[in-house]
Amino acid sequence: GEISRMFSGGTPNVGIPEYYNGNIPFIRSAEINSDQTELSITDKGLSNSSAKLVEKNTLLYALYGATSGEVGLSRISGAINQAILAIIPEKKYSSLFIKNWLYKQKSSIIEKYLQGGQGNLSGSIVKELTIHFPSLPEQEAIGELFQTVDQLLQLQDQKLATLKEQKQTFLRKMSPAQGQKVPEIRLQGFDG
């Protein structure tokens, strides 16, 4: 039987300025895991296009281009375009479990359906995928485990970025500036 409801969106006509710069975040495939979007659309842009609204925490799957096969839970409510498939599972299925399953299967899905990186994924391809589900409590426990791991990885990425920034600052301040003979910061015990 059906495990979910799925739909894609669309893009408002870019030639009509009043469809853009509104209050609805416009989520594109590279932004499925982001809490902000580069573009936003207006109510008029939404109603005059096939863009579709999704709630925060909706399972999103990238169908086209370089991001094909990327999966995430939306961090914001917004509208999606045609390059994204929203997947809304029935009550006995966990979004987190499906997200992690799709993440794990990404390379085999790409290899099978996008030979040589050509073409696009589609809702009908996703509907044909076979997922073996444990009980809902086990799905939720598995999903939560990987969500915790993802959060830890994100924290480590932030720590690494901060450390790289600090290194750049020290490199800049511990080397003499142009026209200077001594750096702004010196190690203790060194002078001259």
Regions found by a protein language model. Name each.
Residues 128-130, 134-192:
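Amphipathic alpha-helical segments with low aromatic content
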Residues 70-74, 114-120, 173:
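Short beta-strand/turn micro-motifs at beta-sheet edges
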Residues 13, 47-48, 148:
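Short, solvent-exposed loop/turn positions at domain surfaces
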Residues 14, 78-85, 103, 115-138:
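A short glycine-rich beta-alpha junction/loop motif
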Residues 22, 28-30, 37-103:
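A short beta-sheet element
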Residues 107-108:
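Extracytoplasmic/periplasmic mature domains of Sec-exported, cell-envelope-associated bacterial proteins
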Residues 1-10, 35, 186-192:
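Non-catalytic DNA-recognition/assembly elements of restriction-modification systems
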